[in-house]
From Swiss-Prot:
Enzyme class, broadest EC rank: oxidoreductase
InterPro entries: 3oxo_ACP_reduc, NAD(P)-bd_dom_sf, Sc_DH/Rdtase_CS, SDR_fam
Keyword Signal: no
Keyword NADP: yes
UniProt: substrate binding residues: S144
Gene name of the record: fabG
Known function: Catalyzes the NADPH-dependent reduction of beta-ketoacyl-ACP substrates to beta-hydroxyacyl-ACP products, the first reductive step in the elongation cycle of fatty acid biosynthesis.
Pathway(s) served: Lipid metabolism; fatty acid biosynthesis
Protein's UniProt name: 3-oxoacyl-[acyl-carrier-protein] reductase FabG
CDD domains cross-referenced by the UniProt entry: BKR_SDR_c
SMART domains the UniProt entry points to: PKS_KR (SM00822)
Binding site for NADP(+): G14, G15, S16, R17, D65, V66, N92, Y157, A158, A159, A160, K161, I190
Active-site residue numbers: Y157
Length: 248
C-alpha cells in the first residue's frame, strides 16, 4: 500500500464529525491505523464504521472525555497495548460556550478552558513518554484564528486557543531533541456544524474579512494536518499553520 502515513498509528480526538472526521479519513486513506476519540458513544461508533467503509481500513473508536486525565491515560495505555506505538496525535476536541465577559459564568469559563486547553495537557502528558521512548512523534494541536485575533463573546475560547499555541511552542522546545515535533493549526471560518449554526448576517460579516472570499472546508484543514503528520514537515516544529483564507 502506498501513502504518506503507511504503518503509522494516529489518534484523533473529537474525530466523530467536522474537522476531526475529515482528518481521520485522510489519515486512514494515507495508510495510517487511526483511532478516533469522542464523548458520544453512538455517534463515535457510527463515525468509525463510516470511516472504515469509506477508506477500506479499520478505523476504531474509543469513548474518552479528554477533560478527564484518568480516562485519557487509561486509553493511551489501551492503544499502546494494541498498536505498540503512537506516531501521531491530533488534539482536535473542543467546545464553545459563548458569552460577553460581563455575562459569562465561572462554569462557562471553566468548561471551555478545561475541555479545550486542559485536554491538551491531559493528552500530551500521556503520550509524551512513549513518544520519547520511540524517539519519534508528531503532535498536532488544533488552535483557531480566534486564538490569534480574539473575538467578542469568546474570551474563554480565545484564551484556550491562544494557550494551546503557547503550550505547543514550549513543548516543542522540550522534546525537539527527541525527534518529536509539535505544531498547531489555526483554522479560520470553516464549514462545520459550529459555523452552520450562525445566522446569515453573522456569516456574511465573517466572510467580509476573508480575502479568499469563501468558507473553508474541513478537508482543507485535514490536508494541513497530513502535511504536519508526514515526513514532508520533518524540519518543522513549534509553528502555527494558519488555514484561514488570509484572515490572520
Amino acid at each position: 500500500m502506498s501513502g504518506l502515513l503507511v504503518n503509522k498509528t494516529a489518534i484523533v480526538t473529537g474525530g466523530s464529525r467536522g474537522i476531526g472526521f475529515s482528518i481521520a479519513k485522510l489519515f486512514a486513506e494515507q495508510g495510517a491505523n487511526v483511532q478516533i476519540w469522542g464523548i458520544n458513544g453512538e455517534a463515535g461508533q457510527a463515525a468509525a464504521q463510516t470511516l472504515s467503509e469509506q477508506t477500506g481500513r479499520q478505523v476504531s473508536f474509543a469513548l474518552v472525555d479528554v477533560s478527564k486525565n484518568d480516562m485519557v491515560s487509561a486509553q493511551v495505555q489501551n492503544f499502546l497495548a494494541e498498536y505498540n506505538t503512537i506516531d501521531v496525535i491530533v488534539n482536535n476536541a473542543g467546545i464553545t460556550r459563548d458569552a460577553l465577559l460581563m455575562r459569562m459564568s465561572e462554569e462557562e469559563w471553566s468548561s471551555v478552558i478545561n475541555t479545550n486547553l486542559g485536554s491538551i495537557y491531559n493528552v500530551c502528558s500521556a503520550v509524551i513518554r512513549p513518544m520519547i521512548k520511540a524517539r519519534s512523534g508528531a503532535i498536532i494541536n488544533i488552535s483557531s484564528i480566534v486564538g490569534l485575533r480574539g473575538s467578542p463573546g469568546q474570551t474563554n475560547y480565545a484564551a484556550a486557543k491562544a494557550g494551546i499555541i503557547g503550550f505547543s511552542k514550549a513543548l516543542s522546545k522540550e522534546v525537539g531533541s527527541k525527534n518529536i515535533r509539535v505544531n498547531c493549526i489555526a483554522p479560520g471560518f470553516i464549514d462545520t456544524d459550529m459555523t452552520k449554526s450562525l445566522n446569515d448576517n453573522l456569516k456574511n460579516e465573517w466572510l467580509k474579512g476573508v480575502p479568499l472570499g469563501r468558507v473553508g472546508m474541513p478537508e482543507e484543514i485535514a490536508k494541513a494536518a497530513l502535511f504536519l503528520a508526514s515526513d514532508g514537515s520533518s524540519y518543522i516544529t513549534g509553528q502555527v499553520l494558519s488555514v484561514d483564507g488570509g484572515m490572520a
